[in-house]
Amino acid sequence: MLEERLGVNRSSIYAEFGSKQELFEASLERYRETVVDQRFGPLAEPGAGLDAISAVFDFYGDAAEGPAFGRGCLLCNTTIEPGPDDPTGSQAVPRYLERISNAFKSALDDAARNGEISGSTDTMQEAQFLTASVLGIFVMLRAGVPPAAISGVAGAATRHLASLESP
């Protein structure tokens, strides 16, 4: 299929990337750069705070209605499908999860500094919870869960953020 889409033969692809495994790893890296960094990168910008986190969940809640997300997330699928013994998944997935968790933590740290949330909030624990929430949304997308349920989960994450706000 790839050969047909690109109009090249398999040996040309392997000459460029070395092997099917190396092609897949290059695809994962490109996905991280173009999708993960684009979606989660703004969370690490100074002053991001709770609004930036809410925007991520709003995006996925709204996007669940569209056809582009029917198969979920490439890196999440790489985690689920091949299993923990797959060398690509075992290398790429921890970096992916760390990138997302660090982005959420950065925005939460900004929120704490700006007084949006209490300074005593465990921002690492909250970041890990938000990472698990967004990955859960990706799994739901992959499983073909109705869009209304996915939007509901995204809304619950946003309401959780509101519960962290300082009085």
Which positions does each model-derived feature cover?
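Helix-turn-helix
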Residues: 1-22, 26
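Amphipathic alpha-helical packing segments from all-alpha helical-bundle domains
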Residues: 36, 51-54, 87-113, 124-128, ...
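Amphipathic C-terminal alpha-helical segment
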Residues: 63, 110, 130-147, 160-167
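Hydrophobic alpha-helical segments that form the core
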Residues: 71, 76, 121-140, 153-160
